[in-house]
């Protein structure tokens, strides 16, 4: 069996979500950098031309959640990142959905300034921030950051999604307000500090910061 290949990009939160899962599960893999848009050339790897995607022997798969679920099933002896309890597993997927479809999708509408030196219109910012804060309130209602990990004592894919997305969102939006737009996310700062004592999260976050700040400098920020 060949070593698993992860095709992705250091700043991509979806690539980093998969990378965190691989590191936490201690699955051997090799990274192949693919810049956004470049993957249109490889229809086998990603039918929609999106990153990340993986190659495991002759099997290709894209979509970060699909990949993470595949890793859980294909490597049953590795550290589990999906709770065995059906209700907890469903809660995990709910948290991931809030992070990715509400917070991340809202943030993407307004952090173009940081990377491309083009600020969105004020009304776009306000609309997107309202949606982002809706996601923050949802995570607070679920007490996501009140324990050592999001769903209790054990790390899950929800933690991979959170640590891949929330630090990026916070940094990318730092030009837009004197305070973090995630300042009302209860317990998040302490949660981030805990995760940054653990090697997989240190590795991924440090690499993300280095690449992101390089992009921001080139954009003149």
In which residue ranges do the predicted regions lie?
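Juxtamembrane helix-loop transition sites at the ends of transmembrane segments
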Residues: 29, 121, 180, 220-221
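Acidic/histidine-enriched, glycine/proline-rich intrinsically disordered or flexible terminal extensions
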Residues: 207-221
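A late-sequence structural motif
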Residues: 198-199, 204
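Short capping/connector residues at structural and topological boundaries
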Residues: 86-87, 155, 206
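GST-like fold's C-terminal all-alpha helical module
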Residues: 103-197
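Extracytoplasmic ligand-binding clamshell segments of periplasmic binding protein
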Residues: 151, 204-205
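GST-like domain detector, emphasizing the conserved glutathione-binding G-site
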Residues: 1-126, 145, 150
